Amino acid sequence: MNLDLREIPAVYINLQQDVERKNSIVDVLDECGFENIIRVDGEYTPDRPLAGCSYSHYKALNEVDPPFIIFEDDCKAKNFRTIIDIPDDSDAVYLGISSWGRMNSHSGPCVQYEDLNGGLLRIYNMLSAHSVLYLDE
């Protein structure tokens, strides 16, 4: 199935006080050509930042109907392809992962993946993502 990512709502997670990050991610999404950009208020948990991040993703999943793409507010677009081909039975597609997750390919607890073709990866274990396309509930 071919998808034009620009036609899918771009949902970004952002803490209300992080105005600079908000401006940065909106600029990134505008430059990529997204037509519908939606902000979800991130959860601030200073003692448990990973829990706050996870809960923020959970909030986004419950506030917006699929299909949509979730972006974290610190992501950057590198080699952004506007049209992608994905399997028809996909429920979710990781569009980008952080450098922290990628540095441990097949060797650590962060991320394990297999390169299927031309940058399309099958993810086996993921703890760090910067954007995820959700196609179904």
Predicted regions and their residues:
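An acidic/histidine-cluster motif and surrounding catalytic segment
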Residues: M1-F71, C75-E137
